[in-house]
Structures are given as C-alpha cells and as structure tokens.
Amino acid sequence: MLTAFIICGIICLPCQLKAFATAAENENFARLNNDLQLLIDDNKNGVPGVGAAVIKNGRLVYEKTLGSRYIDNENTQNNLPLTRDTKLRIASLSKVFVAAAYMQLSEEGKIDLDADISRYLGFTLRNPNYPDTPITSKMLLSHTSSLRDGEVYTIPSKYSLQELFRPEGIFYESGAHYAPYGEAPGEFFCYTNLNYGILGTIIEKVTQTRFDKYMKQAIFDPMEIDASFNITDFNEAALSDFGLIYQKQEYGVWNTDGPWIAQVDDYSTLKIYGNNLYNIYNYDEYITGTNATIFFPHGGLRISLAGLEKWMQMLIDNGKYNGKRILTEKSIDEMFKPYWTLNETKTNGDTYSGLMNCFGLGIQNVKNIDKDRFLPDRDIEMSGHFAEAYGLLAGMFIDREHKNGFIYIMNGMSGPESSNSGAYSGMYSWEEKVCSAILNNAFPEL
C-alpha cells in the first residue's frame, strides 16, 4: 500500500497527517484517502491509478498516490505502484508550461504579445476569411486565434507548419485549419491544440533553440523538475519508471469488465537506443523553427506529481521558486486575467460542452457558469487547466488570492467518454468524483 505524504515545511511525514492538523482536518484527510481508494477498488467504473495534492494557505498539506502505474494482466504480482515520482504524459496541462515559457520571452522583450505572429513565423499566417485581421500571440494563448485543429495538427519533422495553412500544402485539408466567417480572430473561442504547436514554433524562431531543449533550459532545470517534451531525453531505466496510460478498450471496442490495456508509453518491447523507438523520435534532421508540433507542445510533456506540485507552488508564490524568479508577478497576472468570456447570448465561443466559459492566456477560469463548475452545490472559483488524452485525466487549479490549490491525476478510463459524462458539469464522471472528494474534504470551508 502506498503512503500519504503530508508536508510540514520541507519535511515529508509518511504514514501520518501533519503534526499541527486539527482532529477535524485529520478526519477530512482520512476521508479523502478513502474516497480516492474507492476509485481504485471499483473494477468496472474505476481507474488504475490516482494521485492528488493540496496546497492550503501557501503550503503543501496533502499528497496521495494509489493504484498502479503498470499492470500485468497475466500476473498482478508484477504490477507496479503509481508514486509521486511516476512520470505520465500529462496531456493538456502541458499548455500551462508552454504559456509560461512564452511569457518569459515577452518579459525579455523578444515577443510582443499583441503583434502579428507572422512577424515571428517568417511567413504570413492569416485566416483567409479575415485577411485583414492579424493573429496575435494572445489569440493563440487564449484559443481565440480563429485557427482550428482539423483532422491533423501534428505533422512529421520534415514538413513546415506552412503545409497546414497554404492551399497547396499536404496537410491543408481543404482549409479545415481555418474557422469560418463569423468566428473572428480575437472574438470567438474554440479550444485548439494547434495553437500551441504554433507557439512552440515561435519559441524556436525567436530563441534559435529547439523547443524541447528550450523548455528544459528556461523552465524545468531552473525549477529542478525532471520533465521533458522529448521522450529521448529519458534513458531506458527512466522509461521503465514511466506510468502507462490505460483504457479498457482495444481498437475502439470497449469492455468495462475486461482488462486494462495500455494506450501510451508502453516501452516494454521497444528500446530507445539503436532500435525503433529512437527511429520514431529521431530529430537529427529537424530544422529548428519550422515545425515544433513534433514535440507535442499541446500535450506531450512527461512529468510527475512531484513536478506538478513544484509548478503549482511557483504559481501560488507569484512566480518564485525557492527564491528564484521564474515569472514576474505581472506575467502571472496577465495569464490569469480573463481574455475571453462567454457573452450573455452564448454566441462568441464553443464552450466544450459547457466546461469552458472564461479563458486567460493558457489558463482557464472556472466561474460556475452552466457546466463550468467543480461541485454541484458550492460555487468555488479557481483557475488552472484540465487535461484529457488516451485515458489520462488530470487537472491543476489554484486560488491565487487565498494561496490554495489542488492537483489530480488519473492514468486510465474504464469506459468510453460518451458514457461517462458528468452529472452536473462538463467534466467526466471520474473527475467529478475526484474533485468532489478533494474540495469537500480539503476545502470544506470554501
């Protein structure tokens, strides 16, 4: 069984709650442990692994991981536990890190957030339905760019981003990467992964550094976070410690009573050096500044719960980590400030089934409008980001004013998305259970 780590300053106290906690707090954290365990114990509608962390009043007070990062369906004795150091492909939480790196470049005067991005890309990028309206970095960061994912939004390293946008391009898709007339740049919201592939490419252009290397240099190394957008940064030993992402489906056929089947990061039959895994992720011939989608800036970051905790703490501490300035407070203010809000007639955006009604620069603001809420019976406003891909479900949200925040991660979905919509929100049913457990037990006073 895994242990809960309750943090007092820098001391981890395994197997016990924080020494100065009240009896009520101890009881609440114990109940939270039990609520998370229920998700693991539910063979039909549960998850293979779950992790959670809570910051209250600026201090990390709760951390828990349960379940498995690796499952051997033939012999459960070979299962491996999910831990605070298990790295997972964290999906769209990746975008928050990219946004922060971009804001750093703005602080340095290398990027003007309100300038036409064509200036940085080296080619003109405009929505042909709005040829006179520049697309800016703020529009990319806030998903109001009027660009769309289409069927393909990550393309091989030998191709330039232009192949997505010029009519003769191999990935043009008859203009599917452009919003139609009526969804103007800077006005209409539509959550778009491609925006962050473009941001990653601009980072490369202005720094003359490959995206994955720049992220390590600017973000991960200064914060002592062992994370990367490049799978080849991890040796075979590190890969063996990765957490797999699971679903109870194979080739689109679901069986909720069946086994967990790995969808992502199962490297048990692949070797990173001299074999096909290295060949798959071979960047030797890539030309920096042409197509950073190959690093999946929208969702390809591998990071652990421990790494996410450091990141959440930095945001809560207004840009500082261990005394080092990562972002200015002004930049964090800009990220969290609403850039787009759903209008009263609900005609200026696609709300992602009601989940997204207010967005900043890489940050979603949960405002308890429609299905944009954590709880059915309490309105709790926090800001951060959701994440979902291949079975992973995750979220990180903070209340900057009161220095509170929480993280959750789950590395699998036992049923199809279509059958597991939330009862009261735009989240999935598993997320409603986790968010309810965390907020009702860790933040009953809110």
Residue ranges and their predicted role:
Residues 44-51, 74-139, 180-194, 296-299, ...:
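Short active-site loop at a secondary-structure junction
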Residues 12-23:
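Sec-dependent signal peptide cleavage junction
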Residues 129-380:
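Short, surface-exposed loop or secondary-structure junction motifs
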Residues 3-12:
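Bacterial N-terminal signal peptides
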Residues 27-88, 177-179:
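Short, conserved catalytic-motif segment at the N-terminal edge
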